[in-house]
Each structure stands twice: as C-alpha cells, then as structure tokens.
Regions:
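Nucleotide-activated sugar donor-binding and catalytic core shared by glycosyltransferases
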Residues: 1-215, 225-346
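Conserved C-terminal portion of the radical SAM core fold
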Residues: 222
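Short loop-to-beta-strand entry elements in the cores of soluble alpha/beta enzymes
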Residues: 217-219
Length: 346
C-alpha cells in the first residue's frame, strides 16, 4: 500500500497537522526534535487512530548539526514504509530535514504553511522555509501574501494553493472542553527563539522589563529557554510565575482567559487572534506581516515593550478597535478540506 506520511518533530507541528491527519488516511513520522516528555505527550492526544512512529532522534543532542544524518535516517524509514506522498509543515529543522529526505527519494512533497517570509535570513526558520518551499511539489499557503512571496521567488503558480490555516481547526479540537472561567488578571508569556533566549543579557533584560509591569505573568517555559535560565542562573522574578510546558488544551485555555500575551511564537499569533487577545511580539521581524497593527504589534526593544504593555493595561492600546472589527485572516476558508483535496488531487 502506498502511504501518505506526515513528518513532524515539534509541538506546533502536531497541533497544526492533527485536524488534517484525523481526516486523511495517513501515518505520522515523529523525529523527536522537541524531546522532553511534557513537550509532546499531551499533544499526541489530538491525533485520533493514526499510527505514530517515533524515530526518537533526540539522542543526537545536536539535532541542528546533524541534518544530513537525520535526513538519512528518515530516508531509510520512508523506504520501509513505501511512502509516496509526504507532508511537512512550518519552519523547523524537522521541516527542512523531511523535505530533503523526501526529495532525495524522489517522492512527492507537500508543504503546509508555505510562503511565509520574515525576510530576515539570519533566522534559521527563514532559510528552512525558503529551501522547503522551493523543494515542494505543492505549497499550501495560509494567505494570499504567502502566495505572492512564492511567485516573486519564481515558484510556479501550478505548485501553489491558498488554503487558509489549520490553526483555527486545531483550536476547535480543544476549545469545547475548556471550562468557562472568564478573563483572569494575568499576562501570558512565551519565549523560545534564539534571539531572545540564547544570550544572558537579552533574556534577563527582557524578563526584568516584563516584571516591571507589576502585573501577574504566567510563563510556561520551553525546554530551550529552561536550559538557558538554568545555565545563566536566572532566578524567579516576583511577578513572573515559571511553569512547565502545558499540553495544548491547557495552553489554549491560558490564551483564552489572559489579559494579553507577549510571545515570540508564530503559531501563538494566530491562536491569540482567534480569541481577539492583544499580542506583543518581541522580535525584529515577523513572517505574518498581514496581522500587524490589527491583531498584534511588533515590539523591537524593551522600551517599546513596556510602553505598549502599559497601553494595553490602561485600555488605550492602538489594537483596541482593530481587534473588535478585523475579520480573522486565515480560518474561514475551510483549510482542512482545501489541503486534503490538494493532497488527493495534485
């Protein structure tokens, strides 16, 4: 039997492919790039009745420097599985490795969430996106701006499909089981990008700035960030509550009932928008510029972060009005149907 295989390796990839995998005869190949138990365990519950093959490649401590080797491991597995259609998602190292393995075997590659560009090539995610979209046979885009990016880079129109985003469907998988508790008085914080967490000074100043708001902050800590907090001996700050990573339902609940969110994550931009929560992005660039100043604000330094946070807390943020009236950008297009039709028919 020829199989359709998803290659994934991180929590956001699990959540974003779950609604598709649940409606498509497929298997899941998990590289284990997110390697701590509580990083992936509660997330696999989102996938129903599909075989999940865990390659457990976490034992290669330095995943990033073993791309060729890991691609080779994937090739061996894909051959055994007789896979003919392979799907990757997002912008992680697993995305790139999956794409390389697929094309080495000359199999058909489908790329979900293609065409996003921050135009900041110093970020590993940007070149993962760039290379994967040029290797893909079919690029599924969340938004028309993503399609335009690909056309500008010379990707053939016949290889591009604007489908909408699966995040809306992923949130729907858990929303109904979230208890109704109403908005709580806390800011939700997530940080994982190297530019924010890999340098002691940067990480410490960012946390100190957020602590200065004198407002309760809930901070589920990503393993990469946790390792650096330990390494730099950054102790708890009085207003910031450090938590272990949450499963998807609990994390979405934290978004739903937060006052506002500070996050450098791409997926959180979409999740926050669904609940119309103001979001501040502590980064220099974003790969979702179409959301800026409607659903979120890019804060390029700590001074801006402090100012915009105070504006939200004082009820005079420039996001107040747009958040009420802007239609959701990616969710209403039936992305699951569009992507499944694309996989079956192209």
């Amino acid at each position: 039997v020829n199989h359709t295989i998803f290659i994934i390796g991180t929590r956001p990839e699990i959540t974003k492919i779950a609604p598709i995998a649940n409606n498509l005869n497929s298997k899941i190949l998990f590289t284990g790039q997110h390697f701590s138990k509580n990083m992936s365990n509660g997330f696999f519950d989102l996938i129903k009745n599909r075989e999940i093959i865990n390659l457990n490649l976490k034992r290669f401590k330095n995943f990033d420097n073993n791309i060729r080797f890991i691609a080779n491991q994937l090739e061996i597995k894909l051959k055994k599985l007789n896979a003919n259609k392979i799907i990757v998602q997002g912008d992680t190292n697993t995305t790139l490795v999956g794409a390389i393995a697929t094309k080495t075997l000359n199999k058909k590659l489908y790329f979900i969430e293609s065409g996003m560009r921050s135009f900041d090539i110093s970020q590993i995610e940007e070149y993962n996106r760039l290379i994967t979209s040029h290797l893909a046979d079919i690029n599924f885009c969340n938004h028309i701006t993503n399609k335009e990016n690909l056309l500008n880079e010379g990707v053939s129109k016949s290889k591009i499909l604007v489908t909408g985003s699966t995040v809306y469907s992923a949130v729907n998988l858990v929303d109904s089981s979230i208890e109704s508790i109403g908005e709580k008085k806390y800011i939700l914080l997530t940080l994982h990008r190297p530019e924010n967490v890999d340098k002691k000074e940067k990480l410490l100043n960012l946390l100190k700035t957020i602590n200065k708001l004198n407002y309760r902050v809930i901070f589920p800590v990503h393993p990469r960030t946790k390792a650096n907090l330990d390494k730099y001996d950054i102790q708890k700050l009085e207003n910031i509550k450090f938590l272990k990573p949450k499963n998807y339902k609990d994390f979405i609940e934290l978004i739903k009932y937060s006052k506002f969110i500070i996050s450098d994550s791409g997926g959180v931009q979409e999740e926050a928008a669904i609940y119309r929560k103001p979001l501040l992005i502590p980064r220099q660039y974003t790969e979702r510029p179409e959301m800026l100043n409607k659903f979120n604000i890019l804060v390029k330094n700590n001074k801006e972060l402090l100012m915009q946070s105070k504006n939200i807390l004082n009820g005079n943020s420039c996001l107040e009005k747009p958040l009420l009236v802007t239609p959701l950008l990616y969710g209403k297009m039936k992305p699951i149907e569009n992507i499944i039709n694309g996989i079956n028919n192209k």
